UniProtKB/Swiss-Prot annotation:
Compartments (UniProt record): Cytoplasm; Nucleus
Assembly information from the UniProt record: Part of the SCF (SKP1-CUL1-F-box) E3 ubiquitin-protein ligase complex SCF(FBXO32) formed of CUL1, SKP1, RBX1 and FBXO32.
Domain F-box: 218-266
UniProt keywords, alphabetically: Cytoplasm, Nucleus, Ubl conjugation pathway
Motif Nuclear export signal location, chain numbering: 164-168
GO function terms (MF aspect): ubiquitin-protein transferase activity
InterPro entries: F-box-like_dom_sf, FBX25/32
Listed GO biological process terms: cellular response to dexamethasone stimulus; muscle atrophy; negative regulation of cardiac muscle hypertrophy; positive regulation of cardiac muscle cell apoptotic process; protein ubiquitination; response to denervation involved in regulation of muscle adaptation; response to electrical stimulus involved in regulation of muscle adaptation; ubiquitin-dependent protein catabolic process
Annotated protein name in UniProt: F-box only protein 32
GO terms under cellular component: cytoplasm; nucleus; SCF ubiquitin ligase complex; ubiquitin ligase complex; Z disc
Motif (Bipartite nuclear localization signal): 275-290
Length: 350
C-alpha cells in the first residue's frame, strides 16, 4: 500500500496570510515568498503585542474588581426559599444566595434593623464565612465596610462593631493558618488582604474621638431622677449602664441601684439560671450586678430586635417584617414566623 502522507516526524508546513489568501511559507533556498518574511515577522510582533495588551488589561481589571465597592446582588424585598428540587423548580436556595439577594445594604441604614444585620454578620463571620460563595463573601465585606463608615460618621454602636471586627479577624486568622485543609474561595492573598482591611477598620474605631454636640440644651443630668431611672431601664446591656454611671457622679449612684440590675437579670435570664448563679454581698443581700456579669459569661443573653426577617409558612417566602410579599393565604400575617439571626442561618442547613 503506497504511503500517501508526509513523514509523521516532519516539522510540518508554515503558512502566511497574504492579500491573495493563505500561502505556504518557504525558506530562502527555494527563493519563494522571501519578501513575505518581514511582513510575517511584523505580524508575529503585532500578535505578541496584542497578547501583552490583553494580559495587561486583564490584570488591571482584576485589581479593580478586588477593590470595587459594587455589590453583585439583587435588591429585593423577599425571596423564595426552597430546600429541594421539584419538577417546576430545580436546585435549592443557599445562605450565600439569600445573603446576596436580600437588601442588607439598605437595612443597615434603618436603626430598627441595624442590630439585626450586625448580629447576622457576626454569626456569619464566626462559622459560616467559608460556606458563602465568592460573590457573597465580597458582598459581606462591602456591607461590613458600610457599617464601619456609618459608625465612624454617627459615632454610635462603637463597641458592637469592635466585637464584630474582632470576631471576623479571629476567624480569618484561623482560616489562613488552615489553608490547604479547609475550603477557601479565592486566592490566599485575597484573604490576607481582608485581614489587613479588618485591622485597619479596628484602628479607625480605636482612634475615634466622640465630639460633643454643638448645641447646649438639656442633658440627662438635668432631668428628674425618676426619668433618669426610666431611661436606664431601657438599656439592655449592663456595660452601657456602667459606662453611663461613669459619665457623671450623680448617674453613678443611680447605676448601682439593685432593683435596676435585678430587672436586667430577670429580663435576660430565666429563674432557673438565676438560682444557679446566686452571689451574696457583704451585707448578706443578693448582688445583682455581679450576678448579671456572671450569668452573661455562662448563658446567652436575650435577643430582641425592632424589625426582623420573617418566613411565611404558607408560601415559603422570606422577607423583612412589615413588607408585603405575594401570598395566596387568606391571612398572610398569621402564617409569618419571625426569625432570629441564628434561625436565619439554621434555615439553610441541609
Amino acid at each position: 500500500m503506497p504511503f500517501l502522507g508526509q513523514d509523521w516526524r516532519s516539522p510540518g508546513q508554515s503558512w502566511v496570510k497574504t492579500a491573495d489568501g493563505w500561502k505556504r511559507f518557504l525558506d530562502e533556498k527555494s527563493g519563494t515568498f522571501v519578501s513575505d518574511l518581514s511582513s510575517y515577522c511584523n505580524k508575529e510582533n503585532l500578535f505578541n503585542s496584542l497578547n501583552y495588551d490583553v494580559a495587561a488589561k486583564k490584570r488591571k481589571k482584576d485589581i479593580q474588581n478586588s477593590k470595587t465597592k459594587t455589590q453583585y446582588f439583587h435588591q429585593e424585598k423577599w425571596i423564595y426559599v426552597h430546600k429541594g428540587s421539584t419538577k417546576e423548580r430545580h436546585g435549592y436556595c443557599t445562605l450565600g444566595e439569600a445573603f446576596n439577594r436580600l437588601d442588607f445594604s439598605t437595612a443597615i441604614l434603618d436603626s430598627r434593623r441595624f442590630n439585626y444585620v450586625v448580629r447576622l454578620l457576626e454569626l456569619i463571620a464566626k462559622s459560616q464565612l467559608t460556606s458563602l460563595s465568592g460573590i457573597a463573601q465580597k458582598n459581606f465585606m462591602n456591607i461590613l465596610e458600610k457599617v464601619v463608615l456609618k459608625v465612624l460618621e454617627d459615632q454610635q454602636n462603637i463597641r458592637l462593631i469592635r466585637e464584630l471586627l474582632q470576631t471576623l479577624y479571629t476567624s480569618l486568622c484561623t482560616l489562613v493558618q488552615r489553608v490547604g485543609k479547609s475550603v477557601l474561595v479565592g486566592n490566599i492573598n485575597m484573604w490576607v488582604y481582608r485581614m489587613e482591611t479588618t485591622l485597619h477598620w479596628q484602628q479607625q474605631l480605636n482612634s475615634i474621638q466622640i465630639s460633643r454636640p454643638a448645641f447646649k440644651g438639656l442633658t440627662i443630668t438635668d432631668l428628674p431622677v425618676c426619668l433618669q431611672l426610666n431611661i436606664m431601664q431601657r438599656l439592655s446591656d449592663g456595660r452601657d449602664l456602667v459606662s453611663l454611671g461613669q459619665a457623671a457622679p450623680d448617674l453613678h449612684v443611680l447605676s448601682e441601684d439593685r432593683l435596676l440590675w435585678k430587672r436586667l437579670c430577670q429580663y435576660h435570664f430565666s429563674e432557673r439560671q438565676i438560682r444557679k448563679r446566686l452571689i451574696l454581698s457583704d451585707k448578706g443581700q443578693l448582688d445583682w450586678k455581679k450576678m448579671y456579669f456572671k450569668l452573661v459569661r455562662c448563658y446567652p443573653r436575650r435577643e430582641q430586635y425592632g424589625v426582623t426577617l420573617q418566613l411565611c409558612k404558607h408560601c415559603h417566602i422570606l422577607s423583612w417584617k412589615g413588607t408585603d410579599h405575594p401570598c395566596t393565604a387568606n391571612n398572610p400575617e398569621s402564617c409569618s414566623v419571625s426569625l432570629s439571626p441564628q434561625d436565619f442561618i439554621n434555615l439553610f442547613k441541609f
